[in-house]
From Swiss-Prot:
Localization: Cytoplasm
Protein name: Phosphopentomutase
Main location: cytoplasm
Recorded name of the encoding gene: deoB
EC number: 5.4.2.7
UniProt binding sites for Mn(2+) 1: 14, 327-328
Cofactor: binding details: Binds 2 manganese ions.
Length: 396
Protein backbone atom coordinates (compact mmCIF):
# COMPACT_ATOMS: atom_id res chain seq x y z
CA UNK A 1 0.00 0.00 0.00
CA UNK A 2 1.46 3.36 -1.00
CA UNK A 3 0.90 6.38 1.22
CA UNK A 4 -0.87 9.47 -0.20
CA UNK A 5 2.12 11.59 0.87
CA UNK A 6 5.65 10.22 1.18
CA UNK A 7 6.69 13.13 3.41
CA UNK A 8 4.80 15.51 5.67
CA UNK A 9 6.42 18.74 6.86
CA UNK A 10 4.71 20.06 10.01
CA UNK A 11 5.45 23.67 10.98
CA UNK A 12 4.28 25.03 14.34
CA UNK A 13 4.24 28.83 14.50
CA UNK A 14 4.60 28.88 18.27
CA UNK A 15 1.76 30.87 19.90
CA UNK A 16 0.16 32.16 16.66
CA UNK A 17 -3.46 31.69 17.77
CA UNK A 18 -6.46 32.78 15.69
CA UNK A 19 -9.11 33.89 18.17
CA UNK A 20 -10.48 33.01 21.59
CA UNK A 21 -11.27 29.32 22.06
CA UNK A 22 -14.78 28.17 23.00
CA UNK A 23 -13.68 27.80 26.65
CA UNK A 24 -11.52 30.96 26.78
CA UNK A 25 -13.54 32.34 29.71
CA UNK A 26 -12.40 29.45 31.91
CA UNK A 27 -8.82 30.62 31.31
CA UNK A 28 -9.61 34.36 31.69
CA UNK A 29 -8.83 34.83 28.01
CA UNK A 30 -12.06 36.27 26.60
CA UNK A 31 -11.41 38.48 23.59
CA UNK A 32 -7.94 37.13 22.93
CA UNK A 33 -6.92 36.96 19.25
CA UNK A 34 -3.19 36.79 18.70
CA UNK A 35 -3.17 37.13 14.90
CA UNK A 36 -5.75 39.90 14.69
CA UNK A 37 -4.27 42.02 17.48
CA UNK A 38 -0.70 41.47 16.27
CA UNK A 39 -1.51 42.61 12.73
CA UNK A 40 -3.67 45.63 13.66
CA UNK A 41 -1.79 48.72 12.50
CA UNK A 42 0.78 46.67 10.58
CA UNK A 43 1.47 48.32 7.21
CA UNK A 44 2.77 45.35 5.22
CA UNK A 45 0.80 42.62 3.47
CA UNK A 46 1.36 38.89 4.01
CA UNK A 47 0.84 37.77 0.40
CA UNK A 48 1.85 34.13 0.73
CA UNK A 49 -0.14 33.36 3.88
CA UNK A 50 -3.02 35.26 2.28
CA UNK A 51 -2.79 33.19 -0.88
CA UNK A 52 -2.84 29.98 1.19
CA UNK A 53 -6.11 31.09 2.79
CA UNK A 54 -5.14 32.30 6.26
CA UNK A 55 -7.63 35.18 5.91
CA UNK A 56 -10.38 32.69 5.04
CA UNK A 57 -10.17 31.16 8.53
CA UNK A 58 -11.02 34.43 10.29
CA UNK A 59 -11.17 38.13 9.30
CA UNK A 60 -7.67 39.57 9.75
CA UNK A 61 -5.96 42.92 9.14
CA UNK A 62 -3.64 42.93 6.07
CA UNK A 63 -4.66 39.35 5.15
CA UNK A 64 -7.67 39.30 2.82
CA UNK A 65 -10.03 36.44 2.14
CA UNK A 66 -9.27 34.78 -1.23
CA UNK A 67 -11.60 33.07 -3.70
CA UNK A 68 -9.13 30.35 -4.69
CA UNK A 69 -7.03 29.46 -1.61
CA UNK A 70 -3.75 27.62 -2.07
CA UNK A 71 -4.33 25.33 0.92
CA UNK A 72 -7.01 23.48 2.81
CA UNK A 73 -7.93 25.60 5.81
CA UNK A 74 -9.77 25.45 9.13
CA UNK A 75 -9.19 26.11 12.82
CA UNK A 76 -8.96 23.69 15.74
CA UNK A 77 -9.79 24.12 19.43
CA UNK A 78 -7.86 22.51 22.27
CA UNK A 79 -9.31 19.63 24.27
CA UNK A 80 -6.56 19.39 26.89
CA UNK A 81 -6.70 21.29 30.17
CA UNK A 82 -3.81 23.65 29.56
CA UNK A 83 -2.46 26.30 27.22
CA UNK A 84 1.28 25.71 27.40
CA UNK A 85 3.69 24.59 24.70
CA UNK A 86 4.06 20.99 25.86
CA UNK A 87 0.32 20.43 26.23
CA UNK A 88 -0.38 21.91 22.78
CA UNK A 89 2.34 19.89 21.06
CA UNK A 90 1.48 16.66 22.83
CA UNK A 91 -2.16 17.09 21.81
CA UNK A 92 -1.11 17.74 18.20
CA UNK A 93 0.49 14.29 18.28
CA UNK A 94 -2.58 12.55 19.67
CA UNK A 95 -2.70 12.96 23.45
CA UNK A 96 -5.39 14.55 25.61
CA UNK A 97 -3.80 16.08 28.72
CA UNK A 98 -6.28 16.22 31.59
CA UNK A 99 -3.80 17.19 34.32
CA UNK A 100 -2.41 20.63 33.49
CA UNK A 101 1.17 21.62 34.17
CA UNK A 102 1.53 24.24 36.87
CA UNK A 103 2.83 27.78 36.45
CA UNK A 104 4.28 29.89 39.24
CA UNK A 105 3.58 33.60 38.72
CA UNK A 106 4.60 34.31 42.34
CA UNK A 107 7.67 32.10 42.40
CA UNK A 108 8.03 28.55 43.68
CA UNK A 109 6.61 27.43 47.04
CA UNK A 110 8.85 27.61 50.10
CA UNK A 111 8.60 23.84 50.54
CA UNK A 112 10.12 23.20 47.10
CA UNK A 113 12.83 25.82 47.62
CA UNK A 114 13.77 24.19 50.93
CA UNK A 115 13.98 20.76 49.26
CA UNK A 116 16.25 22.10 46.51
CA UNK A 117 18.51 23.78 49.08
CA UNK A 118 18.84 20.70 51.28
CA UNK A 119 19.39 18.42 48.27
CA UNK A 120 22.10 20.61 46.68
CA UNK A 121 23.68 22.26 49.71
CA UNK A 122 23.29 25.60 47.94
CA UNK A 123 21.00 28.53 48.72
CA UNK A 124 18.26 29.53 46.25
CA UNK A 125 17.97 33.21 45.27
CA UNK A 126 15.64 35.26 43.03
CA UNK A 127 12.71 32.78 42.84
CA UNK A 128 10.37 34.79 40.63
CA UNK A 129 9.30 35.12 36.99
CA UNK A 130 11.89 37.05 34.97
CA UNK A 131 13.68 37.20 31.65
CA UNK A 132 16.93 35.26 31.68
CA UNK A 133 19.15 38.20 30.78
CA UNK A 134 17.49 40.44 33.36
CA UNK A 135 17.82 37.95 36.22
CA UNK A 136 21.50 37.34 35.46
CA UNK A 137 22.23 41.07 35.36
CA UNK A 138 20.49 41.39 38.72
CA UNK A 139 21.88 38.32 40.53
CA UNK A 140 24.94 37.28 38.51
CA UNK A 141 27.56 39.01 40.65
CA UNK A 142 25.93 37.75 43.86
CA UNK A 143 25.96 34.23 42.44
CA UNK A 144 29.68 34.48 41.63
CA UNK A 145 30.47 35.54 45.20
CA UNK A 146 28.24 33.04 47.00
CA UNK A 147 27.71 30.03 44.73
CA UNK A 148 23.96 30.34 45.25
CA UNK A 149 21.52 29.04 42.63
CA UNK A 150 19.61 31.66 40.63
CA UNK A 151 16.19 30.04 40.31
CA UNK A 152 13.51 31.71 38.21
CA UNK A 153 10.48 30.93 36.06
CA UNK A 154 8.37 32.46 33.28
CA UNK A 155 4.76 32.34 32.14
CA UNK A 156 5.48 28.74 31.06
CA UNK A 157 5.59 25.75 33.45
CA UNK A 158 9.39 25.87 33.74
CA UNK A 159 11.98 26.06 36.52
CA UNK A 160 15.26 27.57 35.34
CA UNK A 161 18.56 27.46 37.20
CA UNK A 162 21.30 29.92 36.24
CA UNK A 163 24.91 29.73 37.43
CA UNK A 164 28.28 31.06 36.29
CA UNK A 165 30.30 28.32 34.59
CA UNK A 166 33.43 29.26 36.60
CA UNK A 167 31.54 28.99 39.90
CA UNK A 168 29.39 25.90 39.35
CA UNK A 169 30.92 23.62 36.69
CA UNK A 170 28.56 22.46 33.96
CA UNK A 171 28.57 18.85 35.16
CA UNK A 172 27.44 19.94 38.62
CA UNK A 173 24.76 22.27 37.24
CA UNK A 174 23.42 19.48 35.04
CA UNK A 175 23.42 17.07 37.99
CA UNK A 176 21.49 19.61 40.09
CA UNK A 177 18.92 20.00 37.30
CA UNK A 178 18.52 16.23 37.00
CA UNK A 179 17.80 16.00 40.73
CA UNK A 180 15.33 18.89 40.56
CA UNK A 181 13.69 17.20 37.55
CA UNK A 182 13.02 14.08 39.66
CA UNK A 183 11.78 16.17 42.57
CA UNK A 184 9.31 18.16 40.48
CA UNK A 185 7.65 15.12 38.89
CA UNK A 186 5.58 15.07 42.08
CA UNK A 187 1.96 15.92 41.09
CA UNK A 188 1.91 18.73 43.66
CA UNK A 189 4.56 20.56 41.59
CA UNK A 190 4.15 19.14 38.03
CA UNK A 191 6.62 21.43 36.27
CA UNK A 192 6.98 20.83 32.54
CA UNK A 193 10.69 21.55 32.11
CA UNK A 194 13.77 22.15 34.22
CA UNK A 195 16.32 24.25 32.32
CA UNK A 196 20.03 24.65 33.06
CA UNK A 197 21.02 28.23 32.16
CA UNK A 198 24.81 28.62 32.44
CA UNK A 199 26.44 32.00 31.82
CA UNK A 200 29.92 33.51 31.64
CA UNK A 201 31.52 36.95 31.83
CA UNK A 202 31.98 39.70 34.40
CA UNK A 203 29.47 41.90 36.27
CA UNK A 204 27.84 44.25 33.79
CA UNK A 205 28.84 42.01 30.89
CA UNK A 206 27.32 38.57 31.47
CA UNK A 207 26.28 36.37 28.54
CA UNK A 208 24.36 33.11 28.52
CA UNK A 209 26.22 30.27 26.83
CA UNK A 210 25.02 27.64 24.37
CA UNK A 211 25.40 25.01 27.12
CA UNK A 212 21.73 25.34 28.03
CA UNK A 213 20.13 21.97 28.71
CA UNK A 214 16.44 21.13 29.03
CA UNK A 215 15.09 18.36 31.23
CA UNK A 216 11.57 17.71 30.02
CA UNK A 217 8.97 15.14 30.93
CA UNK A 218 8.24 12.26 28.61
CA UNK A 219 4.76 12.52 27.07
CA UNK A 220 2.09 10.87 29.23
CA UNK A 221 1.41 8.25 26.55
CA UNK A 222 2.41 7.03 23.10
CA UNK A 223 2.28 9.67 20.39
CA UNK A 224 2.02 9.44 16.61
CA UNK A 225 5.77 10.05 16.56
CA UNK A 226 6.35 6.79 18.47
CA UNK A 227 4.15 4.91 16.00
CA UNK A 228 5.99 6.40 13.01
CA UNK A 229 9.43 5.61 14.41
CA UNK A 230 8.39 2.06 15.38
CA UNK A 231 7.15 1.52 11.81
CA UNK A 232 10.49 2.56 10.33
CA UNK A 233 9.60 6.09 9.25
CA UNK A 234 11.85 9.11 9.76
CA UNK A 235 10.82 11.64 12.41
CA UNK A 236 13.09 14.66 12.01
CA UNK A 237 12.70 17.13 14.89
CA UNK A 238 13.82 20.70 14.13
CA UNK A 239 14.14 23.39 16.80
CA UNK A 240 12.83 22.65 20.28
CA UNK A 241 10.65 19.72 19.14
CA UNK A 242 13.14 17.17 20.50
CA UNK A 243 13.02 18.84 23.93
CA UNK A 244 9.22 19.13 23.95
CA UNK A 245 8.83 15.37 23.49
CA UNK A 246 11.98 14.51 25.47
CA UNK A 247 13.31 12.67 22.42
CA UNK A 248 10.37 10.25 22.32
CA UNK A 249 9.65 9.07 18.77
CA UNK A 250 12.46 11.19 17.27
CA UNK A 251 14.92 9.66 14.78
CA UNK A 252 16.97 12.82 14.15
CA UNK A 253 17.19 16.10 16.10
CA UNK A 254 18.37 19.38 14.59
CA UNK A 255 18.92 22.45 16.77
CA UNK A 256 18.09 25.97 15.57
CA UNK A 257 19.20 29.46 16.58
CA UNK A 258 16.03 31.37 15.64
CA UNK A 259 13.04 31.35 13.28
CA UNK A 260 15.02 32.08 10.14
CA UNK A 261 17.60 29.43 10.98
CA UNK A 262 14.65 27.09 11.56
CA UNK A 263 13.40 27.76 8.03
CA UNK A 264 16.95 27.26 6.69
CA UNK A 265 17.20 23.90 8.46
CA UNK A 266 13.75 22.84 7.24
CA UNK A 267 14.63 23.67 3.63
CA UNK A 268 17.85 21.64 3.92
CA UNK A 269 15.81 18.70 5.26
CA UNK A 270 13.27 19.07 2.43
CA UNK A 271 16.13 18.79 -0.09
CA UNK A 272 17.11 15.36 1.34
CA UNK A 273 15.48 12.06 0.51
CA UNK A 274 13.54 10.55 3.41
CA UNK A 275 10.18 9.00 4.18
CA UNK A 276 8.19 10.20 7.17
CA UNK A 277 7.82 13.62 8.80
CA UNK A 278 9.83 16.71 9.54
CA UNK A 279 8.52 18.67 12.53
CA UNK A 280 9.62 22.29 13.04
CA UNK A 281 8.84 24.63 15.92
CA UNK A 282 9.37 28.37 15.30
CA UNK A 283 9.76 29.61 18.85
CA UNK A 284 10.57 33.31 18.33
CA UNK A 285 6.92 34.33 17.89
CA UNK A 286 6.30 33.18 21.47
CA UNK A 287 9.60 33.65 23.29
CA UNK A 288 10.77 36.97 21.82
CA UNK A 289 7.48 38.73 21.08
CA UNK A 290 4.39 37.13 22.62
CA UNK A 291 5.58 36.91 26.23
CA UNK A 292 7.23 40.32 25.95
CA UNK A 293 4.02 41.81 24.50
CA UNK A 294 6.01 43.16 21.56
CA UNK A 295 3.26 43.62 18.99
CA UNK A 296 5.45 45.24 16.34
CA UNK A 297 8.21 42.63 16.64
CA UNK A 298 5.61 39.86 16.48
CA UNK A 299 4.06 41.25 13.29
CA UNK A 300 7.46 41.62 11.64
CA UNK A 301 8.34 38.02 12.57
CA UNK A 302 5.17 36.82 10.82
CA UNK A 303 6.14 38.91 7.78
CA UNK A 304 9.63 37.36 7.81
CA UNK A 305 8.07 33.89 7.89
CA UNK A 306 5.72 34.80 5.05
CA UNK A 307 8.69 35.83 2.92
CA UNK A 308 10.30 32.38 3.34
CA UNK A 309 7.31 30.40 2.09
CA UNK A 310 8.08 30.64 -1.68
CA UNK A 311 11.56 29.22 -1.08
CA UNK A 312 10.07 26.30 0.85
CA UNK A 313 7.45 25.71 -1.85
CA UNK A 314 10.11 25.71 -4.58
CA UNK A 315 11.85 22.73 -2.97
CA UNK A 316 8.75 20.59 -2.38
CA UNK A 317 8.30 17.29 -4.16
CA UNK A 318 5.07 16.12 -5.76
CA UNK A 319 4.24 13.78 -2.86
CA UNK A 320 5.02 16.26 -0.04
CA UNK A 321 2.38 17.73 2.26
CA UNK A 322 3.02 20.89 4.29
CA UNK A 323 1.01 21.57 7.45
CA UNK A 324 1.20 25.03 9.06
CA UNK A 325 -0.39 25.44 12.49
CA UNK A 326 0.20 26.70 16.06
CA UNK A 327 0.10 25.30 19.60
CA UNK A 328 -1.74 28.02 21.61
CA UNK A 329 -2.11 31.79 21.57
CA UNK A 330 -0.02 34.57 23.11
CA UNK A 331 -1.95 37.75 22.44
CA UNK A 332 0.50 40.69 22.62
CA UNK A 333 -2.17 43.06 23.95
CA UNK A 334 -3.46 40.69 26.66
CA UNK A 335 -2.81 41.47 30.34
CA UNK A 336 0.24 39.87 31.92
CA UNK A 337 2.73 37.72 30.04
CA UNK A 338 0.94 34.37 29.82
CA UNK A 339 -0.30 32.36 26.85
CA UNK A 340 -3.92 32.75 25.74
CA UNK A 341 -6.51 30.00 25.16
CA UNK A 342 -7.22 30.23 21.44
CA UNK A 343 -8.12 28.35 18.31
CA UNK A 344 -5.11 27.44 16.19
CA UNK A 345 -5.05 27.91 12.40
CA UNK A 346 -4.59 24.89 10.15
CA UNK A 347 -3.29 25.20 6.58
CA UNK A 348 -2.38 22.12 4.49
CA UNK A 349 -1.08 22.08 0.93
CA UNK A 350 0.77 19.84 -1.52
CA UNK A 351 2.11 20.21 -5.09
CA UNK A 352 -0.06 17.24 -6.12
CA UNK A 353 -3.30 19.01 -5.11
CA UNK A 354 -4.72 21.82 -7.24
CA UNK A 355 -8.14 22.57 -5.70
CA UNK A 356 -8.56 23.52 -2.06
CA UNK A 357 -11.48 24.31 0.22
CA UNK A 358 -12.43 24.77 3.86
CA UNK A 359 -12.20 21.72 6.13
CA UNK A 360 -14.59 20.99 8.98
CA UNK A 361 -13.57 22.35 12.38
CA UNK A 362 -12.64 19.94 15.15
CA UNK A 363 -12.48 20.18 18.92
CA UNK A 364 -8.99 18.80 19.31
CA UNK A 365 -5.53 19.56 17.95
CA UNK A 366 -5.14 15.76 17.69
CA UNK A 367 -6.75 15.77 14.25
CA UNK A 368 -3.35 16.86 12.92
CA UNK A 369 -1.75 13.75 14.40
CA UNK A 370 -4.61 11.52 13.25
CA UNK A 371 -4.26 12.82 9.68
CA UNK A 372 -0.51 12.11 9.76
CA UNK A 373 -1.04 8.63 11.26
CA UNK A 374 -3.73 7.84 8.69
CA UNK A 375 -1.43 8.92 5.86
CA UNK A 376 1.34 6.55 6.97
CA UNK A 377 -1.07 3.78 7.96
CA UNK A 378 0.13 3.59 11.58
CA UNK A 379 -1.85 3.35 14.82
CA UNK A 380 -4.44 6.14 15.06
CA UNK A 381 -4.76 8.21 18.26
CA UNK A 382 -8.00 7.85 20.24
CA UNK A 383 -8.87 11.52 19.81
CA UNK A 384 -9.49 13.54 16.65
CA UNK A 385 -10.26 12.67 13.05
CA UNK A 386 -8.34 12.27 9.82
CA UNK A 387 -8.80 14.96 7.18
CA UNK A 388 -7.54 12.79 4.30
CA UNK A 389 -11.04 11.97 3.01
CA UNK A 390 -12.11 15.63 3.13
CA UNK A 391 -8.91 16.46 1.26
CA UNK A 392 -9.89 13.99 -1.46
CA UNK A 393 -6.77 11.84 -1.04
CA UNK A 394 -6.65 8.18 -0.12
CA UNK A 395 -4.38 5.17 0.03
CA UNK A 396 -3.72 3.38 -3.26
Amino acid sequence: MTTPFKRIHLIVMDSVGIGEGPDAAAFNDEGSHTLKHTLEGFKQKLPHLEQLGLGNIAPLPVVSKVTHPGAFYTKLSEASVGKDTMTGHWEIMGLNIMQPFKVYPNGFPAELVKEIESMTGRKVVANRPASGTQIIDEWGEHQMKTGDLIVYTSADPVLQIAAHEDVIPLEELYEICEKVRELTKDPKYLIGRIIARPYVGEPGNFTRTSNRHDYALKPFGRTVMNSLKDSGYDVIAIGKINDIYDGEGVTEAIRTKNNMDGMDQLIEVVKKDFEGISFLNLVDFDALYGHRRDKEGYAQAIKDFDLRLPELMNHLREDDLVIITADHGNDPIAKGTDHTREYIPLLMFSPKIKDYHELSQDTTFSSIGVTIADNFNVELPKYGKSYLKEMGVEHQ
